Amino acid sequence: MAKVLVVEDNPANMTLATFLLESVGHTVLKARDAETGVGLARSERPDLILMDIQLPGMDGLSATGILKADAETRDIPVIALTALAMKGDEERIRAAGCDGYIAKPLSYKDFLETIARDIDKRGTGARTDIPALKI
């Protein structure tokens, strides 16, 4: 299974992302702000980073830029978590260095398919099938 860093300041979104990731066996690292997320990415070297765009203090796009400029973290895929759905937002997100994005509110299937695809690209050997979620 993969180690996934979730950088999200909204407690409900953090709880949901953690639940979904852990339900398929991933280990979740949590950060509530960009600065903590950058530090955890450098120290823990996760297989994937889920980065909220709208964070207090430094925003998620700035944090992604820092990670992509660092030789130690630039190869870690960063997926933006965003409620932004305006024209041009995807281009702005990708220009900042994000490898993809997931729109909020989170959809179980879309969320885990995106995670599985990006983990599989990295070659971690993590399980990439999406089991039925039993609640």
What residues fall within each predicted segment?
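The feature encodes the CheY-like receiver
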Residues: 56-59, 74, 86, 104
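C-terminal output helix
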Residues: 106-115
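The C-terminal output helix
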Residues: 116-132
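Conserved acidic carboxylate
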Residues: 8, 32
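Short acidic/polar segment at the start of the alpha1 helix of CheY-like receiver
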Residues: 10-14
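Charged docking surfaces used in two-component/phosphorelay signaling
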Residues: 15-23
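Active-site residues of response regulator receiver
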Residues: 52, 82
